[in-house]
Amino acid sequence: MGGTKFIQMTVGIILCATLMVSVDQLSAQDAKSPGPDGQFLTLASPIDGEDYALVSRWALKLQDQAKREQRPMFLVLQIPDGASQFHQVYGLADFLTGTEIPDVTIIAWLPESVTGHNAILALSAQEIAIAPDAELGNIGRGKAVPADKREQVLQLIRRGRNPLVNDSIVEAMMNPAADLQQATIIVGEGAEESREVRFLSSTEIRKLQDDGVMVPEVNEVKPSGAVGSFT
């Protein structure tokens, strides 16, 4: 879909390629030590407690290395499609968006489409690298995620780990009834005037307009009633 490029992360893809090479080289030497810049982990589905233990162990190792060497580290997670229990995915996503690993950048690598609860883990990463023919979303697999679980996921997103992912995008992935629009917003005045592109619901756009904000262009990304899955 032409209006969903906000999910694609060119920098993340480059980082993933670099880290995969370094990890392959290190695996022949010492599989128990992090690479020079980070670690690449391939997760299996369903995601469970073993995955939590694996990811958290590596993330904390990398955080220790980042503090010792006074530089950021990267943890790349290859996330599969599949059916995982909500609490298992949420627990890991909660750790990744928490305060224990401030110097570790989490990158989600999606070589294939990821739907269902596994998509929540990708959304908790700071960067998302997605293959050109893959999609991310449809968290409820055609149905709305229950309201209490939607709010839990949105609380994770609001921690601001990924500045390109906002409530409206995630809500569209969790609730087929939600719509998503690509809106051009005019901010500032006179010489300070500029245009920003934001992804918002039609309700949010109307509120901006009611508040006097100029919205000269709106393009529909997902209509209400459609599944929210983006490339």
Identify the residue ranges that each predicted region occupies.
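Soluble extramembrane regions of membrane proteins in the secretory/endomembrane system
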Residues: 27-231
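Bacterial N-terminal signal peptides that target proteins for export
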Residues: 1-13
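Bacterial N-terminal signal peptides
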Residues: 10-22
